[in-house]
Amino acid sequence: MKGEETLKKALLNIGKESPFYYYVLLGVKLVPSKNTRNLKLSFSTTGDVMLLYNPEAIGKKPLRMVQALLIHEVMHIVLQHFRIKPKDERDRKIWDLAMDAAINQYIPELAAFGVPLDVLVKEGHTTDNDTLFVLPPEWMMFENAEMYHKWILEEMERLGRYDVEVVAEFRDNVDDHSGLFEEDVPVEMILDLTKDRTKKAFNLFGNTLPSGVRREVSLSLENPELDWKTLLRRFFGVSIKADRYTTPLRPNRRYDHLPGWRNEYLPRIAAVVDTSGSIVEKELNQFISELEKISNIAGEELWLVQVDKSVTSAMKYRSGKWKDLEIVGGGSTDLQPAIDYSERVLRSEGTVVFTDGHTDVPIARRRILFVLSRYHNEEFLKEARKMYGRDAVVVLS
């Protein structure tokens, strides 16, 4: 009974101190489980979001630590980590590290007992998610799980895959996040179960969140709608780096007995964002969410061009840079200067244009893809498809 009482007290305290997380937790079913070390999320095929907890272990923990562990679990929900698709069991364990690093940095009680990810990888150790918790490298704070996963993979190649495999294997003995990736439960069902409650919680209590968390949750609620990997291949061919995978046909440079890495390529592209006065904040948030997805797939920086009646900004953009992104514009709309800049100055192979279409369709000499906001100009859509083909225009909902 002590564990259940501790859990209830922790929930009440969260309700007083962090109403956003409490509101989301109200939609979670608490299930005692002796097979769980502390806490673990899971989704059932009957439509329940379940939080498994070990009553004995929870009963022995300080109340503040139980609160911190509850917030940690609920952040996996609000950041929609269940949308992540690990390639295999080893990749799932690496995603566990990346997701935990992205979350723990925002929870002081866990950060106080944190070990930076770079130290763990370098020394071949891991945390137990009980007394020690993974944190991002000190020089890479406030990024998302995708960025930390990408960094781990790059360290794999630099140090040799064995080093990171050892770290991943050590996590066999701790509560993992396998419940987030239930194969029997479609991601769409999990989204239906969680997104509405998260959105309501954000609308009611989002202003109580720290600014970094608030922005992360806001972006997660504006999830990219488009399959960018397919779109980029279809329109632009292949040139910039995308996925990396191991192959026995290429020896590892450090360990002869291990497979090496091979890169899959996508095109060198530029992204143009319409920042004219007709674009509202919700549309910009959607554009940035899609831009993040492109950047994650590209695996490297790409050019971002902002435009109203002329080019207002041109910069190298990488995933996570939205935190420092200044939107420049607010005037009337003319996309042509941005297309000319992309093709003539940046010499891109193709251009992705985010706009509401309240302007003339620009002339492009190379490949182009228009991404229109929900409140777009229908005449622009018709004219763009007439000029460049039906598949050259996609519309966000």
Swiss-Prot record:
This chain's protein is named Uncharacterized protein TM_0929
Protein's organism: Thermotoga maritima (strain ATCC 43589 / DSM 3109 / JCM 10099 / NBRC 100826 / MSB8)
Q: What is the lineage of its organism?
A: Bacteria, Thermotogati, Thermotogota, Thermotogae, Thermotogales
